[in-house]
Swiss-Prot record:
Enzyme Commission number(s) of this protein: 2.7.8.7
Function, in words: Transfers the 4'-phosphopantetheine moiety from coenzyme A to a Ser of acyl-carrier-protein.
Organism ancestry: Bacteria, Pseudomonadati, Pseudomonadota, Betaproteobacteria, Burkholderiales
Annotated GO MF terms: holo-[acyl-carrier-protein] synthase activity; magnesium ion binding
UniProt name for this protein: Holo-[acyl-carrier-protein] synthase
Name of the coding gene: acpS
């Protein structure tokens, strides 16, 4: 049964501006440790890839927070929600700490889709109860 649906569109230009203004601190606030390492590697190779990576993660986390109905209130935090990828490349939600406990206690499962184009990153998330 569907527990919740969330969607988000993120303006990549706003993410780029925030990075220019706040530097790595902005990325550290949004990304988990694993995501931050990936962001650093992508940014080193091609800075625009790093910006797009951060924008897609920002968008996916916003969509997930809407799907679970909490928004960005505890236990949902930027860093406790990680967007990983399966071996196939499919994006997946990986949770940590109190958010994982909250999610597991409700026997929920999440599915996320992420895309980006020149100026926008968009995500769609469906959370279902098992």
């Amino acid at each position: 049964m569907i527990y919740g649906i969330g969607t988000d569109i993120c303006d990549v230009r706003r993410i780029r501006a925030s990075l220019a203004r706040h530097g790595e601190r902005f990325a550290q606030k949004i990304l988990s440790d694993a995501e931050f390492a990936t962001w650093q590697a992508r940014s080193a190779r091609w800075p625009e890839r790093g910006v797009r990576f951060l924008a897609t993660r920002f968008s996916a986390k916003e969509a997930f927070s809407k799907a679970i109905g909490l928004g960005l209130t505890m236990p949902m935090t930027w860093r406790s929600c990680e967007v990983g990828n399966l071996a196939s490349g499919k994006p997946t939600i990986v949770l940590h700490g109190a958010l994982k406990d909250w999610f597991d206690a409700r026997a929920l499962s999440a599915h996320v889709s992420v895309t980006d184009e020149t100026d926008y990153a968009a995500s769609f998330c469906v959370v279902e109860s098992l």
